[in-house]
Amino acid sequence: MSFHEVENLTEFLDEVKLKMLNITGSSNKNIKEISDYVLANPGKFIRTQLVFIYGSVIDIEKRKLIELAAASELIHLSTLIHDDIIDEAKIRRNKPTVIAKWGLKKAILYGDFLYTKTFQALNSLENT
């Protein structure tokens, strides 16, 4: 991968993170608090990197790639939250899990919130 491609990937990752914040934005203080916590340490962005590579091979509008990458990361995060609920996990990525920090009900609702907001964002792609 050339320097130019790495520079483009870094820019792409930044745009995806911004899109994730946009998708999960809420005026609800509980949702905002949990979103800020979860998105502060979102992971390695492997799915985003795969979308970037895929997008560099075929001709897809950058805006759509950003939406797809953000959606893939948010769906992954929601599955991790629900997985932590099922496993009653206390720690994820060296931090307390959503269930450990906010309890069962808020963890379930937040995981569902992520799914819902993500699929709403994906639905808007279908019409473009």
Residue ranges and their predicted role:
Residues L21, G25-T128:
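Mg2+-dependent prenyl diphosphate-binding active-site environment of isoprenoid biosynthetic enzymes
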